[in-house]
């Protein structure tokens, strides 16, 4: 095959085929992409490895368009979370209700009274946007909000216990994720760790014996992401508060996930509520906004008015504060808690957590035939009972009864690993990536969080073509 001549960049830029790309991506991006493309084709064209049709304006514009689309595609993508873990940290945790999404849109589009008191016409406090709701729902005297619960714990410790000792049970020196360890956070906050008791048993006398002139606070951490069972003992919040107050010290309680309602009402495991911690005497309570609360990422610090005032004056508060979008979403979510009778209908996270297993199984029965057809004869598709998790460190032992589509390759065991990896990759490569979990030589798709059946079904033909 003889060599062919490449069209010039200028000719391609002025071609009708490239006009839509110019309009969508701009001249500079299109020019750079065309230059790169022609540079790659120059050597093959010189050696006759390309046909004339491959260098037509339409074909080259099409290839440039594919590259530009890939370059400009958003890195933030919607996915189907079919892992069985509802509050999946890697997949975004809590899904916001419609009310919060509308509030975010409003706050993003228009000016708003973020730090402006409409009554007085003077500068306001952004925490006031949710302070009234928090007081109403929890009975807390005051509140401040930062960007996550790790920040809440850090700020509270630094404000109340810097250069002093923080007394905490050895069994509560938890690690969450790969970088949040209570001893490390205390050190960063300038608080000297004074651990008492043992891993499995801590008594009131341990705290009493530890208190001295260097003591700054007592701390209690809810061990939400693991469970110690058997021969155990711990000091209840009310008793710990009495010990702290008897020595003029504050009690800081970190609830981690945190909830404002008794989850057993919806058949979920018991989790300590913010109201209970405050009623039992905790002076400061911290918890997350994007876990069991079902809101945006945030760290809420509630409690004693004087102590919250000290926390708000800490220079770190400005570095850790939340923006208008977070506050708008948080206010909307908190507002839903005013009507607990309809909370499971309106709060997306609670609705998904409390979804009946029978309803999920019926959905699996509907979807199994279509998925089986897309996968072909090389796969067995079975509807099975499944056990999901709340996630994000909440109730690690508890399981949520669910149903899943279990996808198992009809191949010898030694070949199943590759087949499963190929299927996982194909599912992740769909327009709406599907994320499941591997277990027992099969890929499980837990349907607890599958809200959009039509979108899931619409891309099954694409899956079949990817696997063929």
Swiss-Prot record:
Q: Which Pfam families match?
A: Se-cys_synth_N (PF12390), SelA (PF03841)
Question: Where is the PTM N6-(pyridoxal phosphate)lysine found along the chain?
Answer: 291
Q: What is its EC number?
A: 2.9.1.1
**InterPro entries from the xrefs?**
PyrdxlP-dep_Trfase, PyrdxlP-dep_Trfase_major, SelA-like, SelA_trans, SelA_trans_N_dom
* UniProt keywords, alphabetically: Cytoplasm, Protein biosynthesis, Pyridoxal phosphate, Selenium, Transferase
Q: Which SUPFAM superfamilies match?
A: PLP-dependent transferases
Q: In which pathway does it act?
A: Aminoacyl-tRNA biosynthesis; selenocysteinyl-tRNA(Sec) biosynthesis; selenocysteinyl-tRNA(Sec) from L-seryl-tRNA(Sec) (bacterial route): step 1/1
Catalyzed reactions: L-seryl-tRNA(Sec) + selenophosphate + H(+) = L-selenocysteinyl-tRNA(Sec) + phosphate
Q: Where in the cell is it found?
A: Cytoplasm
Write down the required cofactor(s): pyridoxal 5'-phosphate
Q: Which GO cellular component term is one of those annotated?
A: cytoplasm
Is Protease among this UniProt entry's keywords? no
Q: What does this protein do?
A: Converts seryl-tRNA(Sec) to selenocysteinyl-tRNA(Sec) required for selenoprotein biosynthesis.
**What family is it from?**
Belongs to the SelA family.
Q: What is this protein called?
A: L-seryl-tRNA(Sec) selenium transferase
State the species of origin.
Pseudomonas aeruginosa (strain UCBPP-PA14)
């Amino acid at each position: 095959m003889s060599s062919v001549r490449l069209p010039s960049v200028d000719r391609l830029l002025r071609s009708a085929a490239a006009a839509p790309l110019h309009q969508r991506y701009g001249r500079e991006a299109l020019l750079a992409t065309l230059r790169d493309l022609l540079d790659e084709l120059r050597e093959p064209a010189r050696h006759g490895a390309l046909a004339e049709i491959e260098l037509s304006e339409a074909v080259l514009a099409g290839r440039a368009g594919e590259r530009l689309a890939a370059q400009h595609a958003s890195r933030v993508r919607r996915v189907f979370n079919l892992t069985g873990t509802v509050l999946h940290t890697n997949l975004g945790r809590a899904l916001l209700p419609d009310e919060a999404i509308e509030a975010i849109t409003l706050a993003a589009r228009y000016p708003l009274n973020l730090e402006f008191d409409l009554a007085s016409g003077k500068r306001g406090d952004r925490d006031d946007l949710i302070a009234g709701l928090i007081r109403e729902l929890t009975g807390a005297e005051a509140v401040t909000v930062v960007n996550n619960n790790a920040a809440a714990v850090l700020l509270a410790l630094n404000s109340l216990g810097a250069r002093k000792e923080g007394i905490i049970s050895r069994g509560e020196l938890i690690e969450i994720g790969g970088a949040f360890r209570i001893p490390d956070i205390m050190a960063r906050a300038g608080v000297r760790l004074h651990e008492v008791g043992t891993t499995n048993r801590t008594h009131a006398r341990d705290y009493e014996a530890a208190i001295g002139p260097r003591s700054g606070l007592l701390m209690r951490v809810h061990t939400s992401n693991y469970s110690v069972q058997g021969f155990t003992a711990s000091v209840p919040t009310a008793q710990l508060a009495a010990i702290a107050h008897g020595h003029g010290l504050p009690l800081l309680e970190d609830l981690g996930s945190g909830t404002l309602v008794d989850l057993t009402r919806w058949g979920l495991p018991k989790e300590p509520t913010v109201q209970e911690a405050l009623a039992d005497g905790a002076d400061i309570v911290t918890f997350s906004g994007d876990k069991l609360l079902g809101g945006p990422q945030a760290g809420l610090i509630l409690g004693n008015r004087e102590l919250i005032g000290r926390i708000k004056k800490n220079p770190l508060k400005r570095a850790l504060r939340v923006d208008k979008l977070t506050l708008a979403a948080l206010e909307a979510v908190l507002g839903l808690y005013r009507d607990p009778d309809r909370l499971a209908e309106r709060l997306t996270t609670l609705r998904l957590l409390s979804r009946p297993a029978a309803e999920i199984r019926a959905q699996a029965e509907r979807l199994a035939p279509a998925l089986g057809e897309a996968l072909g004869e090389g796969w067995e598709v079975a509807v099975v009972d499944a056990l999901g998790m709340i996630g994000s460190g909440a109730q690690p032992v508890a399981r949520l009864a669910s149903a899943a589509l279990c996808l198992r390759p009809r191949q010898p065991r030694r070949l199943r690993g590759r087949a499963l990896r190929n299927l996982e990759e194909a599912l992740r490569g769909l327009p709406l990536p599907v994320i499941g979990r591997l277990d027992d030589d099969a890929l499980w798709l837990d349907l607890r969080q599958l809200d959009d059946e039509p979108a899931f079904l619409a891309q099954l033909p694409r899956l079949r073509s990817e696997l063929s």
